[in-house]
């Protein structure tokens, strides 16, 4: 491995881990698609976090990656979903999961969906970053409880109706 500078090394690490996540998500989408043509919101939300969680369970280097870079999407001033996409995050499998999620959430217009997906990326990034720093973070019942609680939170985040207050402010800002 020859990199001209530290930035090049960091980008290579991020692209490698992103590719691993995309591949794992693609496997999970294929398994889900073979099971049902209309997955639940919970099953789709699981696609947002379970690939990274499983990789962290299986791979020490991936856990180190989460510890080192998990905070980056939290601290961005830009859309964290767009930032993740611009760094190779998501890929084809991420676009598939996003498309499935949009279809399952007809109550959200494009702007509301974008606000929710940004909040979801921040929630997942924060949660995984914190979890990676815990003892036995990705093994045992406590780790499974973490995963299922995070998926529950994502389901709530996406399933909630847009409040009249939020809609009024969104309309005002158009």
Give short role names for the model-derived ranges:
Residues 42-46, 61-64, 73-105:
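Amphipathic alpha-helical packing segments from all-alpha helical-bundle domains
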Residues 91-174:
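C-terminal peripheral helix-coil segments that are non-catalytic and often amphipathic
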Residues 48, 52, 66-73, 120-124, ...:
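Short alpha-helical scaffolding segments that buttress acidic/His motifs in well-ordered protein cores
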Residues 28, 32, 73-76, 131-135:
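Secondary-structure edge/capping motif, primarily at the C-terminal ends of alpha-helices
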Residues 23-66:
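Hydrophobic alpha-helical connector segments
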Residues 10, 14, 18, 83-90, ...:
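Amphipathic, non-transmembrane alpha-helical scaffold segments
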């Amino acid at each position: 491995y020859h990199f001209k500078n530290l930035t090049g090394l960091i980008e290579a690490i991020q692209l490698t881990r992103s590719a691993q996540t995309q591949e794992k998500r693609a496997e999970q989408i294929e398994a889900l698609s073979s099971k049902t043509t209309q997955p639940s919101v919970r099953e789709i939300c699981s696609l947002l976090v379970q690939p990274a969680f499983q990789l962290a369970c299986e791979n020490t280097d991936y856990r180190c990656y989460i510890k080192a870079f998990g905070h980056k999407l939290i601290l961005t001033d830009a859309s964290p979903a767009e930032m993740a996409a611009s760094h190779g995050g998501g890929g084809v499998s991420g676009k598939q999961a996003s498309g499935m999620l949009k279809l399952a959430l007809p109550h959200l217009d494009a702007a509301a969906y974008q606000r929710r997906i940004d909040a979801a990326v921040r929630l997942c990034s924060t949660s995984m970053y914190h979890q990676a720093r815990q003892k036995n973070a990705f093994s045992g019942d406590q780790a499974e409880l973490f995963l299922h609680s995070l998926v529950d939170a994502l389901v709530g985040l996406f399933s909630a109706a847009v409040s009249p207050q939020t809609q009024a402010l969104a309309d005002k800002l158009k």
